[in-house]
């Protein structure tokens, strides 16, 4: 299966694990069609869980709000300390109350974690943003490759 997304070239942020084809779209010199050939890996395409599973070794399933519990059941290390590369699980604030939200810790600076995630603001959008380390929305972390 191939998913297609059209974005300005300045907005395209592509995982190094993705197989990507970029070609000019007829009549629009500054726009491109980006075809992602990532695999579903058992998650719904373009959800936060799907995005994280494309970039980390995820051997469990479930909605984002069950990931820490499910990772523990799969004998993965979990905890409350942020580490670059860890998966971070969030509960309600701006996040979907029923499904939860997950992202990847891309950095730690000045009392914040830098989170890389998908669908935080808009559907299909990858964001990089700061979240205070002591935010009550952070449920914890999963430490996997």
Place the predicted regions along the sequence by residue:
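N-terminal secretion targeting segments of exported proteins
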Residues: 1-19, 144-145
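Secreted/periplasmic proteins that engage bacterial cell-wall peptidoglycan
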Residues: 15-118
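Aromatic- and glycine-rich peptidoglycan recognition patches
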Residues: 108-145
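Compositionally biased, intrinsically disordered low-complexity regions enriched in proline and serine
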Residues: 6, 33, 52, 142-144
């Amino acid at each position: 299966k191939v998913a297609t997304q059209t974005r300005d070239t300045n907005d395209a942020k592509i995982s190094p694990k993705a197989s990507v084809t970029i070609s000019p779209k007829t009549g629009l010199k500054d726009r491109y069609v980006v075809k992602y050939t990532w695999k579903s890996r058992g998650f719904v395409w373009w959800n936060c869980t799907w995005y994280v599973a494309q970039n980390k070794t995820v051997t469990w399933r479930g909605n984002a709000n069950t990931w820490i519990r499910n990772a523990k059941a799969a004998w993965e290390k979990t905890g409350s300390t942020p580490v670059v590369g860890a998966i971070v699980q969030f509960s309600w604030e701006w996040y979907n109350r029923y499904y939860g939200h997950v992202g990847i810790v891309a950095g730690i600076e000045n009392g914040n974690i830098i989170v890389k995630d998908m669908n935080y603001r808009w559907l299909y959008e990858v964001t990089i943003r700061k979240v205070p380390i002591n935010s009550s929305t952070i449920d914890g972390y999963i430490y996997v490759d």
